Amino acid sequence: MINNYIDITVRLLENILDNEADYVKEAGAKVAESIENDGVIHLFGCGHSHILTEEVFYRAGGLAAIHPILHEPLMLHEGAAASSVLERKNDYAKTFMAEEDIRPGDIMIVLSTSGRNPVPIDVAEIAREKGAFVIVITSLQYSASQKSRHTSGKRLSDAGDIVIDNGAVKGDAVLKSANFDIAFAPTSTVTGAVILQSIFAEAIETMVNDNFTPPVFISGNVENADAHNQALVDKYNERIPLLGMNL
């Protein structure tokens, strides 16, 4: 099974390289422009999609200007099934997005592989109303195969200024076994991480070419990194309180 899973995942990544690279580069340019003008990069996802927002937060080799919107009832540790119920509620996003410090010139990256549930769609639309540029990572194939749960009939792909397709199949899982009817081994976490890191790599290269020093963390396990990292925490702590919380 390892050969099958890796073969399929590699093909998905090759497809992203062939068909989504221009959108990734465009997204990277927008991220660079935002950071060069004191903007912040917000990320949001429900359920397992939220994992990707934490993957790029306070990350060795990653950008400091990253703000994951971590609304705990929509994560998994306060009730996995309950989070799925909440994700399907129209207008629920208003209960937590009103207080988010999203400003004109910021970037909002919203992740949802199915793209059908109301909360990610509403997050994208509220962020745009606040002046953010919206980047969406979703599966166009998966989304098109399912009816939208949003009252407007929209899917997440309808709410993005840039839409990047992670290529996930319907249901996300790609493997099957004889004598077992349920597909297993999802791919969207792998492809989503690659897409996000590629966007930020493009952004960092753009900033370097613009003679702007990218705000990139060094691993805290490398000697003499602490002062460098603390300076970045101090720079962004007002906009991203999670960076310095409980210090």
From Swiss-Prot:
Pfam families: SIS_2 (PF13580). InterPro entries: RpiR-like_SIS, SIS_dom, SIS_dom_sf, SIS_GmhA/DiaA_subfam, UPF0309. GO terms for molecular function: carbohydrate derivative binding. CDD domains: SIS_RpiR (cd05013). It comes from the Bacteria. Residues 31-214 form the SIS domain. GO terms for biological process: carbohydrate derivative metabolic process. Belongs to the UPF0309 family. HAMAP family: UPF0309. This is UPF0309 protein Lm4b_02611.
